[in-house]
């Protein structure tokens, strides 16, 4: 009976391996140091995939994969292979930060083909994380690019519709006015200094010429008459001192011409865009704002409290500082280094700093340790303030 069941299991295992990789799913639980690993004296942000997962795939995992969530956000992760291990290296830290992965969360992978994996992210109680499903237009560059293209297309269509409704004679008048303006800029000469009497005489003579010289205010007035406006336009009243005017060609200000065209367009009211933030952004904002209950400066994380006889090496200090940044605790954290005497022997105890117990635990002598949803009751002994019963 046992041999037959073993043969059936092997046959089922082989049949599963022969399936297309697109039909296979893998559930990975975030446990231990899923964010980083220690190599020598360096902390490497990476994740090691169990070899049992890799062995069930027919094909090899490429050196670079795409992790795509339900909201169509894709993240590139580099894959390192060493000693039959598959490791998510570069890009994995950004993925963890974006979706606020914590210990106890889980991820379901499904091979999609072309080096792509569909990823479903669950929290500690098995609910799908909202930040991996909801589409955030503010963070998605593709949506932003699509919005920009749509806005440009809409503005272009409105501009063409305005030109189509104009009278052909008015359009021809605009073209002629533009050509005349360009011609006057190309052949304009410096304006000589004239007295008021001479200027009046020359002004009367200028009206008999083919191309009259006009001031910016007069050109704006003629432009407004050639293009009917829906509202009256007030002409600027400027006093020009011809005796101190510099020698430069007469040119029509582009601002006046643009102003007259802008007034012909209807005023558009635009409401400010509504942005939706992910849980990661809301948490970062909440811990960066000042609080009345906080006794430290804004953005400063309290230093951990370490036992009197405990000394951390440089690697352990890096690990502790890295974990504290992701815990966001408002009170100091007690750090203990587990030794062999703490986990072996007839009576295994763990010493806790008396200063930490007096200041943050008060008169409590029963505490609760929790990890991955489980809780264990611990009793504190007054002698040496060591954790005894329940440890």
Curated annotation (Swiss-Prot):
Q: What segment(s) does the record annotate as region Disordered?
A: 143-232
Q: Which residues bind DNA?
A: 32-125
State its location(s).
Nucleus
Sorted keywords for this record are: DNA-binding, Nucleus, Transcription, Transcription regulation
Under InterPro entries, the record lists: B3_DNA-bd, DNA-bd_pseudobarrel_sf, REM16-like
Look up the record and report any one GO term of the cellular component aspect.
nucleus
Q: Which GO terms describe its molecular function?
A: DNA binding
UniProt biased composition (Polar residues): 172-226
Taxonomy, superkingdom: Eukaryota
CDD domains found in the cross-reference section: B3_DNA
Xref: PANTHER family? B3 DOMAIN-CONTAINING PROTEIN OS08G0325100-RELATED (PTHR31391:SF121), B3 DOMAIN-CONTAINING PROTEIN OS11G0197600-RELATED (PTHR31391)
Question: What is the protein's given name?
Answer: Putative B3 domain-containing protein Os08g0325100
Which organism is this entry from?
A: Oryza sativa subsp. japonica (Rice)
């Amino acid at each position: 009976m046992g041999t037959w069941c073993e043969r059936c299991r092997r046959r089922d295992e082989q049949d599963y391996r022969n399936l297309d990789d697109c039909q296979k799913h893998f559930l990975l639980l975030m446990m231990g140091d899923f964010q980083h690993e220690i190599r020598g004296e360096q902390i490497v942000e990476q994740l090691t995939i169990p070899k049992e997962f890799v062995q069930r795939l027919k094909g090899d995992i490429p050196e670079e994969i795409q992790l795509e969530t339900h909201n169509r956000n894709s993240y590139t992760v580099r894959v390192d292979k060493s000693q039959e291990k598959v490791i998510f290296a570069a890009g994995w830290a950004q993925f963890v930060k974006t979706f606020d992965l914590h210990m106890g969360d889980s991820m379901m992978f499904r091979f999609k083909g072309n080096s792509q994996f569909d990823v479903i992210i669950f929290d500690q109680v098995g609910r799908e994380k909202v930040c991996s499903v909801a589409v955030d237009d503010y963070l998605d560059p593709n949506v932003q690019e699509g919005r920009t293209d749509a806005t440009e297309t809409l503005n272009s269509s409105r501009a063409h519709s305005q030109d189509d409704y104009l009278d052909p004679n008015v359009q021809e008048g605009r073209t002629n006015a533009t050509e005349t303006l360009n011609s006057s800029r190309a052949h304009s000469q410096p304006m000589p200094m004239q007295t008021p009497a001479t200027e009046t005489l020359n002004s009367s003579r200028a009206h008999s010429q083919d191309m009259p010289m006009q001031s910016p205010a007069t050109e704006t007035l003629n432009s407004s008459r050639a293009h009917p406006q829906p509202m009256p336009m007030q002409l600027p009243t400027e006093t020009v001192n011809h005796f101190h005017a510099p020698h430069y060609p007469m040119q029509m200000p582009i601002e006046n011409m643009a102003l007259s065209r802008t007034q012909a367009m209807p005023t558009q009211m635009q409401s400010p865009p509504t942005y939706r933030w992910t849980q990661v952004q809301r948490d970062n904002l909440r811990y960066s704002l000042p609080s009345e209950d906080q006794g430290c400066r804004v953005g400063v994380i309290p230093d951990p409290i370490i036992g009197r006889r405990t000394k951390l090496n440089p690697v352990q200090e890096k690990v502790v500082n890295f974990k504290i940044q992701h815990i966001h605790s408002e009170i100091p954290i007690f750090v203990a280094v587990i030794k062999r005497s703490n986990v072996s022997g007839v009576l295994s105890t763990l010493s806790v700093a008396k200063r930490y117990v007096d200041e943050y635990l008060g008169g409590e002598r029963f505490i609760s340790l929790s990890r991955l949803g489980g809780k264990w009751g611990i009793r504190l002994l007054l002698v040496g303030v060591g954790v005894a019963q329940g440890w």
